[in-house]
Amino acid sequence: CQSLKDFGVEVTIVPCDRDGVLDIDAFKNSFKENTKLVVMSHASNVCGTVLDAEEVGKICKEKGVFFALDAAQSAGVINIDFEKFNLSALCLTGHKGLLGPQGTGALLLRHELAEALDPVISGGTGSASHLLTMPEFMPDKFEAGTLNLPGIIGLNASLEYIRRVGIDTIFETEKQLAQLFIEEIDKLPNVKIIGVRDWNKRVGTVSLDFESID
């Protein structure tokens, strides 16, 4: 957030509770006249809690602001519905739940937002090497320099695997392993699980709070 402030962007941070659950009332009250964009993590990389993207997307639509969802921890593990969540942008990395190589990722943009954005990185001018500036058409205007083709091919293979196995199957396996881990951790003294216990509202990321350690 600090880097955005350095560029003159006004940032409002909406709190979550100890388990990582978003305070919806605080979120609704956080909008200002100049609010343009809401950015939210779909699943916490600390406690595994999944935030209610559908509800947040509905509120953003009512307020008339763009909604960007960071799905780094959820893509490939739980289903994401671009339209149902009213997303303007979906950001994800390839090397986590999507099982792809490091250095890969994706940014899915709704047309209205893509048209409103200017390239933030330039170099090589992408597919239009004869130009002195980045192309103005999609997706080339956001693809500076040489693409990571080996990584993209590897990510494509991972996506094919996920499609073949099924996200629901992957989530069920992750759920079983995490549940077993949590059950055994619960037997230990002075150790608490951080995050919600409802498996409809979390992924397999599990963090621990050791009461004997400050």
Identify the function of each model-found stretch.
Residues 1-214:
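Pyridoxal 5′-phosphate
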